[in-house]
């Protein structure tokens, strides 16, 4: 069986680690929940030498580069791990597409040279250049992190943006997609892992309210919502993400094809 080294054992990577343990793999990881300190260079290099596969879920610095590639990129390249690199990226690399569909052939912000610097898109391209399998993820939800939780906590919002759509994915569907790629030695390249139904965030919030018997939050304009810069940026992008390649190449399909099944499983 394989040995997986994970950089950044967080919410999503933790689910992947659990799934790989179930497949009989050995898993080591950096991060607060891992067994190796990211800054312990000797320990990390030793783990890199032993690992058959490497997965990074570490996001790039907002105004800087990718921490993993900056610290260990040379070691990754020199250790001949090109056929065993995996990276969790974001569908945000596609930028705003005015509601149009995007797939893995759609140029990213970095590839299109759109002028504005985007650390995530640049990291995405850097990992692809190294021969990695790059998983582009939309909005992630799952236990403890869903519209149900936001409604119960009084944090749910409804923003009045007609025709605004987002894609999303259940965290366990990310895990199953990455596991399929790890176990079956998927070809290098980008893979979108999202569900089958891009839709407005309001639609999901309203369904969550119905499931819980809660009243709907007030409908607000973007200005009235007084969102943080990060949250506001989220609403400035509008796209539908195709998952066709992951289905064809990985033999993957989401267990929760829409938010309806996903939220029902979280009740």
Question: Where do the model's predicted regions map?
Answer:
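NAD(P)-cofactor binding segment of oxidoreductase domains
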Residues: 49-88, 93, 125
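Active-site "gating" loop of Rossmann-like NAD(P)-dependent oxidoreductase/epimerase domains
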Residues: 91-114
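Active-site Tyr-X1-5-Lys
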Residues: 110-136
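Glycine/proline-rich active-site loop of Rossmann-fold NAD(P)-dependent oxidoreductases
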Residues: 118-121, 140-152, 180-191, 197
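A conserved pocket-lining segment of Rossmann-fold NAD(P)-dependent short-chain dehydrogenase/reductase
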Residues: 149-169, 173, 177
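Mid/C-terminal beta-alpha module of Rossmann-like enzyme folds, strongest
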Residues: 177-178, 184-231
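Conserved C-terminal active-site "lid" loop/helix of NAD(P)H-dependent oxidoreductases
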Residues: 206, 225-253
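Amphipathic terminal alpha-helices
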Residues: 257-267
């Amino acid at each position: 069986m394989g040995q997986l080294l994970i950089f950044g054992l967080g919410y999503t990577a933790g689910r992947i680690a659990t799934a790989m343990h179930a497949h009989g793999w050995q898993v080591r990881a950096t991060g607060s929940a891992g067994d190796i300190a990211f800054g312990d260079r000797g320990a990390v290099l030793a783990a890199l030498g032993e690992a058959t596969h490497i997965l990074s879920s570490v996001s790039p610095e907002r105004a800087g580069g990718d921490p993993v590639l900056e610290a260990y990129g040379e070691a990754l390249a020199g250790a001949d791990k090109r056929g065993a690199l995996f990276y969790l990226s974001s569908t945000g690399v596609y930028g705003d597409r005015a509601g149009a569909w995007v797939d893995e052939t759609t140029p990213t912000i970095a590839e299109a040279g759109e002028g504005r610097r985007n650390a995530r898109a640049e990291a995405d391209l850097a990992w692809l250049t190294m021969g990695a399998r790059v998983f582009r993820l939309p909005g992630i939800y799952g236990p403890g992190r869903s519209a149900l939780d936001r409604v119960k906590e009084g944090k749910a919002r409804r923003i009045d943006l007609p025709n605004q759509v987002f894609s999303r994915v259940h965290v366990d569907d990310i895990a199953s997609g990455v596991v399929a790629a790890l176990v079956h030695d998927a070809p290098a390249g980008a893979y979108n892992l999202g569900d089958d139904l891009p839709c407005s965030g309001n639609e999901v919030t309203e369904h969550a309210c119905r499931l819980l018997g809660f009243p709907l939050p007030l409908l607000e304009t973007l200005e009235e919502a007084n969102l943080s810069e990060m949250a506001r940026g989220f609403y400035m992008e509008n796209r539908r993400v195709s998952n066709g390649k992951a289905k064809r190449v990985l033999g993957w399909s989401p267990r929760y094809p829409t938010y309806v099944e996903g939220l029902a499983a979280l009740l």
